From Swiss-Prot:
Binding-site positions, 1D-myo-inositol 3-phosphate: H43, D54, A55, G56, G57, M58, N59, K112, Y145, T169, R189
Binding site for Mg(2+): Y333, R334, A336, T360
Protein's UniProt name: D-inositol 3-phosphate glycosyltransferase
Catalytic activity: 1D-myo-inositol 3-phosphate + UDP-N-acetyl-alpha-D-glucosamine = 1D-myo-inositol 2-acetamido-2-deoxy-alpha-D-glucopyranoside 3-phosphate + UDP + H(+)
Keyword set, alphabetical order: Glycosyltransferase, Magnesium, Metal-binding, Transferase
Annotated S-S bridges: none
Example GO molecular function: acetylglucosaminyltransferase activity
Amino acid sequence: MAYPGGMAIPCQDTAAAPRPAAVSALPARSSPYLRRVAVLSLHTSPWAQPGTGDAGGMNVYIRNTSTVLARRGVAVEIFTRATSSDDPPSWEPVPGVTLHNVVAGPFEGLRKEELPSQLCAFTAGVLRECVGHEAWRHSLVHSHYWLSGQVGWLIKDRLGVPLVHTAHTLAAVKNVTLAEGDVPEPLQRLVGEGQLVAESDRMVANTQVEAGHLTQYYAADPQKIDVVPPGVDLGMFRPGDKAAARAELGLDPSEQVVAFVGRIQPLKGPDILLAAMAEVMRAKPGVRLLVVGEASGSGLSPEGIMATAERLGVADNVTMWPAQPPAQLAKVYRAADLVAVPSHSESFGLVAIEAQACGTPVVAAKVGGLPVAVADQVSGVLVDSWAPERWQAEIASLLAAPERLRAMGRAGVAHAGRFSWEATADGLLASYRAALRGGALAPMRAVRG
């Protein structure tokens, strides 16, 4: 099949293909053969603030799953690229998790798109750390995103350990749903992802939708794909008093607030939301758009969003905040009447599940894993278009129905309660064991998908 980016990869009919193994809860204990896992996150540190630079849902995923795995008795060593001379070579952010900052290229000035030039340097740094001991001490390698996957592939080949890979996003899918003005993913990434599908011992997909994309666009073997949905920190993201949250954040208690949380880039669709909200605000006084996040890559910026709001005449009703730590972010969700996720591509949609866990309904694009993260017409609404007028209509309808919003909020708490990082760790442990055995998982019931 040919797709934007210029590359053709054989595809198979996903309807006729066997369904990938779906992973659900397993006993909370680690295998005696699974002692230590090397986690590769080249382009962003899991302890970086989500919503800044290239940090987002993947960071949240690695941080939480590593923490839970460590509690289960699996030592986790994370390797990421150092981005400051102040970064310590190694440190322990939580007990049982060691984070190594590998020097690979200059600390500043390299965009994510330029990091393929540093794959050799990063691989050399990882190997020096690992081979410098008496014996290779890791049971397996788990790589995240295609750049890390290339490094993991070489380590697998060099040291003879299994490779588990999680893509998080796929170039072929992003190119099919490309945002207006966004840049297509390059051929080198498409080729690299195809190689990883072939060379990984296991592929972890967030949803059955993502598993289908792997088979459709990359001819992946469904029998080595494990479906493991991400989770949410239900202790951090939980319902709370809306009035108290607004008071703490300095938001007007009389206004209706629609929140956007994420990186300011075309992929996430904040420009679409602003265009829709401008019409909502003109028709209904007392509505505010709260945008929480920072610029990532090129194409959009907080300054550009505010300039557009000025041009549309709604700047007084738009508030921009930088990315927030989890405790503050939970308050943002509780303070909002509605959270909007107009992304062009999402492998899952952690913002959506976090908002629902706090009791706030979600209006989201019907794309990727968002139909799994959001229960349509129950805990939120899915929109099968990126036309601003469609988003305006859905948002206006929800804001005009406070009882419906409250019912959706209650349903969202129940829906989000089905997803936890403990369950995600269970699924990863099952995938790891399958990789160590060199065989496929027996089919299990998915959390959802």
